[in-house]
Amino acid sequence: MHSWLLLAEAATPKGGLFDLDATLPLMAVQVVVLTFVLNALFFRPVGKTVEDREGYISTSRAQAKEKLAQAERLEAELKAQLLDARKQSVAVIQKAEEEVDRLFREALAVAQSEANSVREKARGEVDAEKAKAFSGIDSQAEKLSSLIVDRLLAA
């Protein structure tokens, strides 16, 4: 091990740590070349991919906002249509109820008038039968009274 330390000391130039030889500019050139190579081979494709993803995300967000706005607009339209349909159905139901009520009243009026006419006809028939019965009773009463008078006079 001792020989390695001697070897390391022997390789060190006389200027020390800040000795200006060709190593420092060579390293600077290597860093610049490596930067250009990495820029061409790695940073540009990665940057392009990142930009593409950002573009995709921004277009996706814009499309999502448009779809959300469209969905909200459609929801508002459908709510308005539903409200209109409910109003129309209420109007139709009220109209139907009024029509049923009108038809019921008409049918009731017709039935009452028919019942009144049947009742009047029956009353007329009853009165005619009553008059006929009274006339029949009167004639029978006259016959009976004349028969009684004849028997009383004959007796």
Swiss-Prot record:
* Membrane-topology descriptor: Single-pass membrane protein
Would the keyword Transmembrane helix be found if you checked this record's keyword annotation?
yes
**Pfam families (alphabetical):** ATP-synt_B (PF00430)
Q: Where in the cell is it found?
A: Cellular thylakoid membrane
Q: Name one GO cellular component term.
A: plasma membrane-derived thylakoid membrane
Name the UniProt key words of this record, in alphabetical order: ATP synthesis, CF(0), Hydrogen ion transport, Ion transport, Membrane, Thylakoid, Transmembrane, Transmembrane helix, Transport
Alphabetically, the GO molecular function entries are:
proton-transporting ATP synthase activity, rotational mechanism; proton-transporting ATPase activity, rotational mechanism
The superkingdom of the source organism is Bacteria
Give me the segments passing through the membrane.
23-43
- Family annotation (CDD domains): ATP-synt_Fo_b
Q: Which InterPro entries match?
A: ATP_synth_b, ATP_synth_B-like_membr_sf, ATP_synth_b/b'su_bac/chlpt, ATP_synthase_B_chain
Q: Which family does it belong to?
A: Belongs to the ATPase B chain family.
Role description: F(1)F(0) ATP synthase produces ATP from ADP in the presence of a proton or sodium gradient. F-type ATPases consist of two structural domains, F(1) containing the extramembraneous catalytic core and F(0) containing the membrane proton channel, linked together by a central stalk and a peripheral stalk. During catalysis, ATP synthesis in the catalytic domain of F(1) is coupled via a rotary mechanism of the central stalk subunits to proton translocation. Component of the F(0) channel, it forms part of the peripheral stalk, linking F(1) to F(0). The b'-subunit is a diverged and duplicated form of b found in plants and photosynthetic bacteria.
* Record-linked HAMAP family: ATP_synth_b_bprime, ATP_synth_bprime
**What's the subunit arrangement here?**
F-type ATPases have 2 components, F(1) - the catalytic core - and F(0) - the membrane proton channel. F(1) has five subunits: alpha(3), beta(3), gamma(1), delta(1), epsilon(1). F(0) has four main subunits: a(1), b(1), b'(1) and c(10-14). The alpha and beta chains form an alternating ring which encloses part of the gamma chain. F(1) is attached to F(0) by a central stalk formed by the gamma and epsilon chains, while a peripheral stalk is formed by the delta, b and b' chains.
**Name of the protein:** ATP synthase subunit b'
- Gene name of this polypeptide: atpF2
